[in-house]
Amino acid sequence: QGLAELERRVGVPLFERHGRHTRLRPQATEVLAHARRVVAETRDLARWAETRRTGAAGVVRLGTIDAVAVHYRAEAIRRHRRAVPGLDLRLTVAPSGALFDALLVGDLDLVVCVEPTGPIAGVAMSPCLDESLYAYAPDGAHGRPPEEWGPWVTYPRGSHTREVIAAGLAALGAPFAVVAESNQPEVLREMVRLGMGWAVLPAAQAEAGAEPLARVRRRPVGVRHLVVARRADVVSDAAVDA
């Protein structure tokens, strides 16, 4: 019945009977070759669909702040790339504000950044980790009470981290007179070493390298909360979820 249906659909006699046996006609060779290609391509499609369903392939556009990409999740990112070689993981490192902007316009699928002070419409966030921020001073300036701290080198206006720092210093009664700005913690660290000002930084970046900065006090000035964020209105993607 199946062979008869195939002949009917193709419109060309494909088989002939020889006694009890059915044989392919010569003109059926091309049809058979085509059928084999279709079966192979169908299997390829099934394998592709399986990798998409399980997250073993596809494109993931991940955005993170520098501390996440360099210090906290660098090994996890490398391990995931090795474990899922079919995944095209594209990493963007930028400040939190720029990452949220890129997420909202669809340029990124997932971001790991500093939690904003309030909710952002259309964005779903979940906790990632908490990061303590400590005060650091140039050589010879340690030992002062908070009222005499500064001046400061810090993140630019609009930075989520700067908002955390400003609130923490205000709670301590420390002035927040800013003399220089940079989005890069490593640059701020070098400014402190050069004596340009004080800074509040994550320990992972301030105390790294051959010449680590020394904390002004053991307790942190503040804590910034890092979150994993994605657009709330997008269809679930196994590669992103992984």
Question: What is each stretch, according to the model?
Answer:
Residues Q1-E5, A76:
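Residues within the DNA-recognition helix of helix-turn-helix
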Residues A57-P119, E181-S182:
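Central regulatory/effector-binding core of bacterial HTH transcription factors
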Residues C113-P116, G122-R157, V223-V234:
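Hydrophobic/proline-rich hinge and linker segments of small-molecule sensing/allosteric domains
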Residues A4-L24:
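A short LG(V/I)-centered, amphipathic sequence patch enriched
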Residues Y72, A214-A242:
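A late-sequence structural motif
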Residues V114, Y136, W149-G173, L194, ...:
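Secondary-structure junction motif
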Residues R9-V10, V31-R53:
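Alpha-helical linker/hinge and terminal dimerization helices associated
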Residues V114-A121, P185-A214:
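A ligand-binding cleft/hinge motif common to bilobed small-molecule-binding domains
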